[in-house]
Amino acid sequence: TTGPRTKQLEKELAEYCHVAKLVCLNSATAAEEMNLRVLGIGEGDEVLVPAYTYTATAAAAIHVGATVKFIDSRKDSLEMDYDQMERAITERTKAVIPVDLGGIPCDYDRIYQAVEGKKALFCPKGDVQEALGRVAVVADCAHGLGASRHGVPTGALADFTSFSFHAVKNFTTAEGGASAWRTLPGLDDEEL
């Protein structure tokens, strides 16, 4: 349910994450799916997902009709292999979903280097993809609220971010989740 305290939480978490907008949902999975739908991702599109993750990360892409391409982990690491991720980007790739395992943010510098380097392959569908002009970075930050990388808090590291407030997470409302996003040029945060 929502009410004035939910709106207050959204406002305070947006400020905490250094983003203009954050909305609460019933789960991180719902937030992840919403992020992909806002991006216009669907049938015929590919979403890159690390092989080492909870099923909900891939399920969100499947729910919108996209094809999931799993990326193996780096040797001796739980993070996805960023070189393999870069090689997997094709003209059908619309998003990569890095997973901030155990509250440790991924190497977003390397992820952005990869998606920027493959911009020429990107075929946008819709206003949001057009505004990005490249593969979207849609973070699964279910365990990462409160973490930061190079002084940038989770929520502001990726284009779109999902958080979980499940009972076992570091910030909990017993259930629930949220979606945060960075402001995109030419798009209204309130309309998104």
Identify what each model region corresponds to.
Residues 11, 109, 152:
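Active-site phosphate/pyrophosphate- and oxyanion-stabilizing loops and adjacent acidic/basic residues
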Residues 6, 10-37, 45-53, 71-73:
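Short loop-beta-helix segment that forms the pyridoxal 5′-phosphate
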Residues 1-4:
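N-terminal "arm"/small-domain region of PLP-dependent enzymes with the aminotransferase-like
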Residues 25, 29, 55, 79-82, ...:
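Glycine-rich phosphate-binding loop at the start of an alpha helix
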Residues 131-172:
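Conserved active-site segment immediately N-terminal to the catalytic lysine
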Residues 37-141, 148:
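PLP-dependent aminotransferase-like
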Residues 167-192:
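Conserved core segment of the aminotransferase class I/II
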